[in-house]
Amino acid sequence: MRNNWFTRHPIGFMAFYFVFYLAAFHWLEANITVPDIWVHCRLDDLIPFCKYAVVPYFAWFAWIPFTLFYLLWKAPRSDFWRLCLPLFAGMTIALACYVILPTGLDLRPYRVYGSDIFARTVRWLYATDTPLNVCPSIHVFNSVTLMMAYYRSKIFDEPR
């Protein structure tokens, strides 16, 4: 890989992409308010609502930067770039798909009951995160890409 500014400053590269991604996603949330396609299958109707699912949902958001920084600091630099480039490219392609064909989900319960931390967190999440721009799933893509990075990384080949 050429030794340009981004390769010399991988944290700067991640910060640059983070700002780009958040700006693009914010634009999508503000400008595409009704999906062209509602994504649904009968299996969706069989999945019960579970307010405790917010725990792994929010853990997912910590898992991404943790993995990026872990590979940056512990693994050979090539392992970091083998994660970073496909991850960011896939997220950008997903954003383009959302512009071309907006999708949405209609799976949320009408009301979330309870006053515990989980119910309050779900209500806050529903108020701030629209059920739009869901297919292709960035959550699924990122999870698969991160797991592939762990499986392919040289640091896990060594005996412990």
Segments (PLM) and residue ranges:
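Cytoplasmic juxtamembrane interface segments
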Residues: 1-3, 66-81
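Membrane-interface loops
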Residues: 29-43, 73-159
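Hydrophobic alpha-helical transmembrane segments
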Residues: 54-68, 84-92, 142
